[in-house]
Amino acid sequence: MSAIVIATKNGKCLPVLAASITMYLPDFFTVYLSGSGLILPKHRTITSDNTAVNFGDSYNNVVHQAIEDGHQDLLVCNDDIVFTPYTWQTLAEDLKRIPTEDRGWVATRSDYARGYQNIRFRHEGDRDGLRHASESAIVEVDVIAPICAWIESKNWVDFPPLNWYSDDIQCIDMQKKGLKHYISRAYVHHVGSQTTGHKPMELTQASIPWIRENRPELAELWFKSN
């Protein structure tokens, strides 16, 4: 059983995301949508209220719902992405190529993400036509952003109750369990920052107290000057 898991607050990008799911993703997916009553026309859709006040808890809650309903494969999606005709096909192909015993997150690339996940990243090597040659490779990384990312429910680890740094900490916790994270060749368009806005300093400062109290070793590593 496979589920697409989405949490939203303002839902302003949902109609386009929903249209791309309807057009391009197989109907064996059940869509879990927290924060909106939108029902997709071709996919079984389960909606719920999103009462959480941060990204981490918003997704923890809706992921728990999907897991409790017996879904083993989860495609966790931000509410402001758009699938292409080839996203799922490419991601499914890559899942078959990655060793399963220690597979954690398998994330798509996008045009609004950090590091290697971003197709704008300046990769080594020559361009291959209209792409970077490295876009044709599956890349193992320490941290991914689950903008659109696949995970097995048995490997799920809760996000901390944060907006920023929630994905960093979750990925580190999963690595401690022996799991590895990968960037797929698959791609989604990502609008970006539709809920929290473009406020990096403010969002960082809001996360520091929790990290200092609960993950002091990471606070020492990340915020020495704060």
Predicted regions and their residues:
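Short beta-strand-to-loop element that shapes/binds the nucleotide-sugar donor at the catalytic cleft/hinge
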Residues: 104-121
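Glycine-rich, basic loop-to-helix element that forms the pyrophosphate-binding segment
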Residues: 49-66
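Short beta-strand-to-loop acidic/aromatic patch adjacent to the donor-nucleotide binding site
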Residues: 72-82
